[in-house]
Amino acid sequence: MKLLNSLILLVLTCLVSSINTQFISIQKYDFSGNCKNSSDSASSFEASSESAAICMQNDLLSGIVTNEGVCLIFNEIPTTFLISSNGDYVVILLEIEQLKLVNVLLSVLMITTEVHIYFQLKHLSITHLIPTLKYLTMANVMDNGKLVLTIFNITLSINVMLHMKLKLIPFL
């Protein structure tokens, strides 16, 4: 299992770095109420109202620390980057133009992760969204007007905002 996780991490890192995204690396952190790098390099911790743990390293890189001790590092802070209170997933807000990247990530992450996609429905109807999706496994309209979709592949050309909920893999 450790070998599989390591292989997935390697493939993910290579794929993501090859398409010039903000994503830099996944690093191992000890999570015990603060952000402490296991290699004792400079890092700090902040907690937000969304129960998110934001990891800062050398004041240059930022990311999220999970309860499992995984820190996702970005060279720029994404528009929205939150972690659940129990640390089992992150929610990332992306522009739909980044869909190519999302497809690459999902093709790798779907091996061991659960992915939920959230679309803001301000100027779109559901009938415009559902036919553009492949392998749709669940679609629910929330009280706040968002369409929640659980899918295995995405083919979208709609100019909307995207919430991506990824269940994290603990790299032990």
From Swiss-Prot:
Lineage: Eukaryota, Amoebozoa, Evosea, Eumycetozoa, Dictyostelia
Major site of localization recorded for this protein: secreted
Record bears the keyword Transport: no
Pfam families recorded: CfaA_B_C (PF11912)
Organism of provenance: Dictyostelium discoideum (Social amoeba)
Gene name, Swiss-Prot/TrEMBL: cfaB
Domain of life: Eukaryota
Signal peptide residues on this chain, from the entry's feature table: 1-21
List of glycosylated residues: 37, 153
Record's subcellular location: Secreted
Keyword entries, A-Z: Glycoprotein, Secreted, Signal
Record-given protein name: Counting factor-associated protein B
One GO cellular component term: extracellular region
